Structure formats: structure tokens, C-alpha cells
Amino acid sequence: MKNRTEAARAERGRKAVRDRRRCQVGRPASGIAAVVAASGQEGTLYPSALREPVDGPVLKDGNNLSKIGGQVLVGWLKGAKIVTLTLEERATCPRSCEMWRRCYGNSSPFTHRYRHGPELEAALEREVAALCEKHDQVLVRLHVLGDFYSGEYIALWQRLLGRHEGLHVFGFTAWPEKTVNGSRIAWMRDVFGMRWSVRHSGRGGEWGSFTIDWPTE
């Protein structure tokens, strides 16, 4: 019954959705980074935007981001609740990331980033359980900023997916598949399939994602 109600709500939302692409409502992006961090920068440029997990909830309603939205409107996950997680850029990312200095977060001074560590992981355990109790299907966007910062953190998501059948994850990682963290992320795709839809940045092909230089031809 709960799933039918959420699907009906998604259908109403789909009919109401409007085009929010930047090329329709404002100036198209130039492809040139507006703010470039120093090569030695190790964390966010905006330390005042850091939050402790106890300030939570750490999982935010997808409605807070117009490009994501709060609910899946079409497809096999129609009706799923969408939430997002934002960590500290660079502090949680591999140093090999091609976007280290030109990170999206450089132009996001007001976005709250949650400090990583055991308190974050404990908060995620609680919040995912509560969301999966309330909704038949929950889709988590990892990460608006930041990345998978440790093997223990990756293992947390493995446990959560095994524990909650209605949990789904999508996002990107800068960890190459040849690294320990990257190979674990790729292995989880084999285990959980589309429930763990995490792509590797900086490469093409299946499960890859890359930046196209501007201007395009």
C-alpha cells in the first residue's frame, strides 16, 4: 500500500516537473572553473561550512537540490525517496582526483559538509534504518561533495545494503578500480547490481564518467 501511494505521488510530481537546465533559465556554463584551489589545499575552502554529524540529519532531502529532486519520478525505482550526503571535498578524496583544484565545491560556500569519521557512520546507520522503515524504497546520492574516505566506510555501505532490501545508492568516485578502495567499490557492483550504481570518474566505458573539455566541437 505504501509503495502504491509513493508511486502515485511520483506520478503527480512528474507531471508538475519543469525544465531547470541552466541553458534554459540562465547563462550556460563556460566550462572554466570560477574558483581554483591552491595545489596544496587539503580540505574545503570554506571551513565554516563544516558540520558535525550530531548537528544532523546528515542525509538531506533531495528536494533541496533542484538537479536531483526528492523522489524518483519514472522507471523501475519510481516512487523511491531520494536523499543526499555531502562530505568535505579533498579531505575525503584521493589525491589523484583530476578535479582536485577545480572541485565543484570551490563554488559552493554555503553547502554544509559533514565531518567524516565514526560519528558520521553511526548517524548513517540510524538514519538509513529510519528512512527504510518509513519508505519502501530509498535512493541515496553519494556524494554531493567528497568521496569514500576509507575501507571501513565502504564496508558500512556494504552492510547497510545487505541489511535493508529497499536501499539503493548512486553516485561517483574518483578512486580508480586498480586501488584498494576502487576495487572494493567495483566488487560491490557485482554483488548488489543496480542497487549500488557508483561510477568511476576520469574514465570512459561502462561504469565510467569523465569531464568534457570546453568548448566542445
Specify the residue positions occupied by each region the protein language model found.
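Class I S-adenosyl-L-methionine
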Residues: M1-E217
